[in-house]
């Protein structure tokens, strides 16, 4: 589980680093090249959580439909040692909020990985064969994700 050292005024969003500018007059959050401008930290945290939920839900629905494996609950948490987890008995998917720092390709891979645990609650050869059937470049995505 990697730790990138960021300055207090920096943020990574969808694999791109931004400098955070707090402006109490900013009515909305907006991006300006390599800057993200927002009113305060609470608004920024809400923005990140809302966007994580939208993106994660989009890919969960996509991969549920493609695989025929359906989850019952999504939880987005701050996790220290995992990017995601799956309770295959309850069909719960848990994703780390920090996953929003990764590329869409990486996010999509992690989501397919967790959805696949609904069928294979392990990391067996069959588990990886199942993933490869749906995402032939998953090993490349996994490398990108871990780098």
Where are the model-predicted features located?
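Walker B catalytic acidic pair
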Residues: 114
């Amino acid at each position: 589980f990697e730790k990138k050292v960021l300055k207090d005024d920096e943020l990574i969003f969808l694999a791109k680093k931004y400098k955070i500018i707090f402006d109490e007059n900013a009515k909305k959050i907006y991006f300006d090249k390599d800057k993200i401008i927002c009113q305060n930290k609470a608004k920024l945290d809400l923005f990140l959580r809302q966007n994580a939920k939208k993106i994660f839900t989009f890919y969960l629905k996509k991969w549920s439909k493609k695989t025929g494996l359906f989850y019952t609950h999504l939880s987005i948490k701050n996790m220290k040692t995992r990017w995601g987890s799956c309770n295959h008995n309850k069909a719960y998917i848990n994703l780390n909020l920090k996953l929003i720092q990764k590329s869409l390709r990486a996010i999509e891979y992690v989501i397919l990985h967790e959805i696949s645990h609904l069928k294979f609650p392990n990391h067996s050869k069959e588990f990886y064969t199942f993933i490869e059937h749906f995402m032939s470049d998953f090993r490349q995505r996994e490398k990108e994700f871990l780098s």
